[in-house]
Amino acid sequence: MFSYRPDVLRELERHGIRPNSGTRPELVRDYVRELYKYEIRRLRGRVVAREFPKSEYASRVDALRRQYLVLAVPARQFTVEDE
């Protein structure tokens, strides 16, 4: 069983992710990473379709990266030790 840190749960909730105590942190992190990769591909498609100038791409990628700060946390640190 896993006890997720409250701050990690808040960040996951921003992306609609609600792991239960039986969900492995590695699985959760992999899922978040796949969401991020999807968003990056979508953003790239938008710049190719000229929905916004190429000069804005880097700042939009940075803004997107900041929405996925939980990816900076190793999966093993998603949880707290049970007392």
Task: State where each predicted segment sits.
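Long, non-catalytic architectural segments outside compact domain cores
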Residues: 1-31, 75-83
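Short, charged, amphipathic alpha-helical segments
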Residues: 54-63
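Short arginine-rich
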Residues: 67-75
